[in-house]
From Swiss-Prot:
Catalytic activity: [thioredoxin]-disulfide + sulfite + adenosine 3',5'-bisphosphate + 2 H(+) = [thioredoxin]-dithiol + 3'-phosphoadenylyl sulfate
Underlying gene: cysH
The protein, known as: Phosphoadenosine 5'-phosphosulfate reductase
Keyword terms: Cytoplasm, Oxidoreductase
Organism of derivation: Escherichia coli O1:K1 / APEC
Localization annotation: Cytoplasm
Tree of life domain: Bacteria
Pfam families for this protein: PAPS_reduct (PF01507)
Taxon lineage: Bacteria, Pseudomonadati, Pseudomonadota, Gammaproteobacteria, Enterobacterales
Homology family: Belongs to the PAPS reductase family. CysH subfamily.
Active site: 239
Amino acid sequence: MSKLDLNALNELPKVDRILALAETNAQLEKLDAEGRVAWALDNLPGEYVLSSSFGIQAAVSLHLVNQIRPDIPVILTDTGYLFPETYRFIDELTDKLKLNLKVYRATESAAWQEARYGKLWEQGVEGIEKYNDINKVEPMNRALKELNVQTWFAGLRREQSGSRANLPVLAIQRGVFKVLPIIDWDNRTIYQYLQKHGLKYHPLWDEGYLSVGDTHTTRKWEPGMAEEETRFFGLKRECGLHEG
């Protein structure tokens, strides 16, 4: 596998970009997660960042990438509606792993948004998508631009939902390389990694949550539910950050 030219790939249509990365992805599938991170740091351009929602299994990718690339900027898009347990978990992991945390928020406060638009998350798919654009997508786009990012690491896994089932290790999204080192990990591998390194699940894991986002669009898991049904009232799985 050789170094890749981001500018040249960005000039290609999306389908051609996917085909151009196919051979590299075939090789990356054979590497372990640490090998994928090391390859990306050697062959993809900086600046590098890692995004995290500090969700149920967030400690895995935060520990894994930060061990190989200490002080890598960690981007959190804070909606202002996270669980209190999430904010405390962020503080705990930032201190424990010595994270270089970069917090980005919407340009409008949560209260101002409610005054202008009402409770967008109660306004069906269209309202949820607008909410996500304001609170997740725009802040992330701003972070990528301000930090001059060319390579973005994230902790998505195929097992998490149908929308992630066919994601490759390496893609181009929002004009930058996107690397998913643990894309093929299952829940057992996640558990083993946490145990091996003395790391914890999000505190709400013990209360029956499989996925954690905002307080108003996250539900506890109940028998018969798919994991993706615990978010956004089952209307959609993605918050917008990992789409497009």
